[in-house]
A protein has these predicted regions:
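C-terminal catalytic core of tyrosine-transesterase DNA break-rejoin enzymes
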Residues: 70, 74, 80, 150, ...
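Catalytic-site neighborhood detector that most strongly recognizes the C-terminal catalytic loop/helix
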Residues: 36, 43, 104-108, 141, ...
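Basic, Lys/Arg- and aromatic-enriched nucleic-acid-binding interface segment
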Residues: 1-9, 20-79, 129, 178
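C-terminal secondary-structure termini that scaffold catalytic or DNA-interacting sites
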Residues: 138, 215-224
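C-terminal catalytic core of Y-nucleophile DNA break-rejoin enzymes
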Residues: 38, 104-124, 130-150
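C-terminal flanking helix
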Residues: 12-15, 19, 204-208
């Protein structure tokens, strides 16, 4: 797995430091060939995302989590970054509209995201709700995951809803599929390398190829 590869790479680095300092004579991982599997990037289709957005929730508890999940789908923010948002993270961007300006807690990479109408509506809905400077009502992560399972069942979605999936949905369904340049998507996601973002572009292209193959099958009777 990728986790094992990363662990072995750390051991290899430690041994190299030991060799450089004369504490060891050989690195047992020197000839190890590293192989990373491409991570599966699940995401919601526009139909699924619309279902989540429009489905009436049976409780305020689930409504809050649904709104925060949708917010992440339209901003690309990870759970911890959305949870940390305060008023000072809202700035006026170069287009004279509200933007989010923050840093990814995972990598410290800067993130600038122009706010679309949907996340702006969600922020307006919860303005002053928390009683402090936080912008959104977000409970502990484990509770969020439990609530998201309930929401998926209510919406008839078989995919496992997580904030990772929301972030992937932003990258694919919300931005790349709608023609946002990959360089812009990479910057909004806080990726340090365009190579990381290209995984999403491949997903979009694979989906496009599948859709066109299905369309070709349906249109076979029109062949000249």
């Amino acid at each position: 797995t990728n986790y094992m590869m990363k662990t072995i790479l750390k051991y290899k680095s430690v041994y190299q430091v030991a060799i450089d300092n004369g504490w060891a004579q050989r690195n047992p991982f020197a000839n190890f060939k590293f192989h990373y599997e491409q991570a599966e990037r699940g995401y919601l289709t526009m139909d699924e995302l619309t279902r989540v957005m429009q489905k009436a929730m049976p409780s305020k508890r689930l409504e809050h989590i649904r709104d925060v999940f949708v917010f992440s789908c339209f901003t690309g923010l990870a759970y911890c970054d959305a949870q940390a948002l305060t008023r000072e993270h809202i700035i006026t961007g170069s287009n004279n509209r509200p933007w989010l300006r923050t840093h990814r807690q995972k990598t410290s990479a800067p993130v600038d995201v122009p706010l679309l109408d949907v996340p702006l509506q969600i922020l307006a809905k919860y303005e002053g709700y928390s009683g402090n400077d936080r912008l959104l009502p977000i409970p502990a992560n484990q509770k969020c995951n439990d609530y998201l399972k309930e929401i998926a069942a209510i919406c008839g979605i078989e995919k496992r809803l997580t904030f990772h999936l929301a972030r992937h949905t932003f990258a694919t369904t919300v931005t790349l599929t709608n023609g946002v340049p990959i360089e812009s998507v990479s910057k909004m996601l806080g990726h340090r390398s365009l190579k990381t973002t290209q995984i999403y572009a491949k997903i979009v292209n694979d989906k496009l190829a599948e859709d066109m193959t299905n369309l070709s099958t349906r249109l076979q009777h029109l062949a000249m």
